UniProtKB/Swiss-Prot annotation:
Cofactor: Zn(2+)
Coiled-coil ranges from the UniProt annotation: none
Organism lineage string: Archaea, Thermoproteota, Thermoprotei, Sulfolobales, Sulfolobaceae
Gene that this polypeptide is encoded by: thrS-cat
UniProt organism field: Saccharolobus islandicus (strain M.16.27) (Sulfolobus islandicus)
Stored InterPro entries: aa-tRNA-synt_IIb, aa-tRNA-synth_II, aa-tRNA-synth_II/BPL/LPL, Anticodon-bd, Anticodon-bd_dom_sf, Thr-tRNA-ligase_IIa, Thr/Ala-tRNA-synth_IIc_edit, ThrRS_anticodon
Protein name, per record: Threonine--tRNA ligase catalytic subunit
Length: 545
């Protein structure tokens, strides 16, 4: 999606100017995950046909932009986008309006929101619309509703997700896996508050450079902020007692809740929310330990993505360099950048460069992952930071008794766990691997006469911590099988009189695979192994065939 966004933004600007020429009053343009949007004052009605007519109008050669606003014929239209710039080289001619709806930025205002896409060639537009049709079939928002995983409620607030029991099960499994990865690297897990005085954000630089996303309030004369990052809190834990060179590296991990005030037009299901959980980690270490630490992080990151079935061709690291707005000296930035380059080169990974896309406090390695629909998602990040240790005056005692500054590394492998859930749901089309599935087995007794045996099968699985359910014979067997498939259940066990008398089950798996006369204990043993190994494929049914 990222590669399309510059031409979409240019298309939105062009359409906004043409709408002004038609007498309408657009107030803002911006980008969503899959399209552009234009908000228009709703004091006059606007139809799809009228928008389409505006598309075909002549376009100004040079778009008048001042202070991130379109300034045209006395109108000022805000450009709600800070990552994509408007290119004079792009010339979108082929538009598709996807949706026109009512948008309420607050209770007292109402706009008409136009969503669409724009491309330079007709072929690009056709290809995208074909892809979009496939993508809509696997939209995580629809899957989440269908599988009863999560929900959003306006009365709770935009961009604030409520995970239901089945959705929380998926999150718990992801967290348990990452805990094992963290343990293998020597991390110590911590917990920090959701709210801090803004003093620490002022020291860190977030207060100035991240101010538009900070949620700030005053209580009893002090100013507080809901945390957008976990790093300052981990720094305070490091500072809580003296450290020596023998203590380093010190690795803290946290499944930390963070909150960022994203603009309402940018919110999109779990992919863009205002509150989420990061699999966050911070390492404090000596300069001489940096390269090996980065190499280990790169190796573990690739290992994690392989576990989810992503191949080497689906994993692409990028080095992101110093942005225009940053803190720290040229010398520190050069040191940090060179450390990342060395680790990438020694890891043997081919990597790209993203100029000026580093964090404000240091350069970083970002990993992009390609899903089953061919989309690239930025997920993992590894960031070297010489600046925050300086700002917070972090120290350790060297072997010579001299106080020195540690280096700090920020890292997250999933990134946002909530966002990663969305990506997995779309990547697997709702059919998650068995270990991640909220319901792993559903037992279907053919008649009520075998309910006792079916319940024994169910309870034996639950004793072994397998997430199993039973669907009694209230509907036809074929209907219950279809329900289980539609709800993403990996394994269905069908039991009738024959199975009850022989201690067997009929196993059905995805892909309409059926294996009869399977000893229940054998199935159970294989399933436990599949789950314990976190296999992506259904290895149990493969072993039974």
């Amino acid at each position: 999606m990222e590669s399309y966004k510059p031409v979409w933004l240019k298309g939105a600007v062009i359409l906004a100017i043409n709408l002004i020429d038609k007498g309408y009053k657009p107030v803002a343009v911006g980008l969503g995950e899959r399209d552009f949007y234009i908000d228009v004052k709703s004091d006059t009605s606007i139809t799809l046909d009228e928008v389409k007519k505006a598309i075909n109008e002549n376009v100004l050669a040079n778009v008048p932009i001042e202070n991130n606003q379109i300034v045209y014929k006395g109108n000022k239209v805000s450009i709600i986008e800070d990552k994509v710039s408007i290119s004079t080289n792009l010339n979108p001619k082929y538009f598709e309006i996807l949706n026109i709806s009512t948008h309420h930025p607050n209770p007292n205002e109402q706009y008409v929101r136009i969503r669409g896409v724009a491309f330079e060639t007709e072929e690009q537009l056709k290809d995208y619309l074909t892809w979009l049709e496939k993508a809509e079939e696997t939209d995580h928002r629809l899957i989440g509703e269908k599988l009863d995983l999560f929900s959003f409620h306006e009365e709770a607030g935009s961009g604030l997700v409520l995970f239901h029991p089945k959705g929380q099960t998926i999150r718990n499994e992801l967290i348990a896996f990452m805990r094992e990865i963290n343990d293998s690297m020597g991390y110590q897990e911590v917990y920090t508050s959701h709210v801090f005085k803004t003093d620490i954000w002022k020291i860190s630089g977030h207060y100035t450079l991240y101010r538009d996303k900070l949620i700030v309030f005053n209580m009893e004369g002090d100013e507080y902020g809901v945390k957008p990052m976990n790093c300052p809190a981990h720094i305070l834990i490091y500072k809580s007692k003296p450290r020596t060179y023998r203590d380093l590296p010190i690795r803290f991990s946290e499944f930390g809740h963070v909150y960022r005030w994203e603009k309402k037009g940018e919110l999109y299901g779990l992919l863009r929310v205002r509150g989420f959980v990061q699999d966050d980690g911070h390492i404090f270490l000596r300069e001489d330990q940096l390269r090996e630490e980065i190499k280990m992080l790169i190796s573990k990151t690739v290992e994690v993505w392989h576990k989810f079935g992503f191949k080497d061709d689906d994993i692409k690291p990028y080095l992101s360099t110093r942005p225009d707005e940053s803190i720290g000296s040229d010398e520190l930035w050069e040191k940090a950048t060179n450390a990342l380059i060395s680790a990438l080169q020694e890891s043997g990974l081919k990597f790209g460069i993203k100029e000026k896309e580093g964090a404000f406090y240091g350069p970083k390695i970002d990993f992009e992952i390609r899903d089953s629909l061919g989309r690239w998602w930025q997920l993992s990040t590894i960031q070297v930071d010489f600046n925050l240790p300086e700002r917070f005056k972090l120290e350790y005692i060297d072997k010579d008794g001299i106080k020195k500054r540690p280096v700090m590394v920020h890292r997250a492998i999933y990134g946002s766990i909530d966002r990663f859930v969305a990506i997995l749901l779309e990547h697997f089309k709702g059919k998650l691997p068995t270990w991640l599935s909220s319901v792993q087995v559903r037992v279907l007794p053919i008649t009520d006469e075998v309910n006792e045996y079916a319940e024994k099968v169910l309870n034996d699985m639950r004793k072994r911590r397998i997430r199993a359910e039973i669907d009694y014979a209230g509907e036809t067997l074929s209907k219950r099988i279809k329900n289980a498939y539609d709800q993403g259940v990996p394994y269905i066990l069908i039991v009738g009189k024959k199975e009850a008398s022989e201690g067997t089950v009929t196993v059905r798996a995805r892909g309409n695979i059926e294996v009869r006369n399977v000893k229940f204990e054998k199935f159970l043993e294989l399933l436990i192994t599949e789950i314990a190994q976190r296999d992506v494929e259904q290895t149990t049914v493969k072993a039974l065939k």
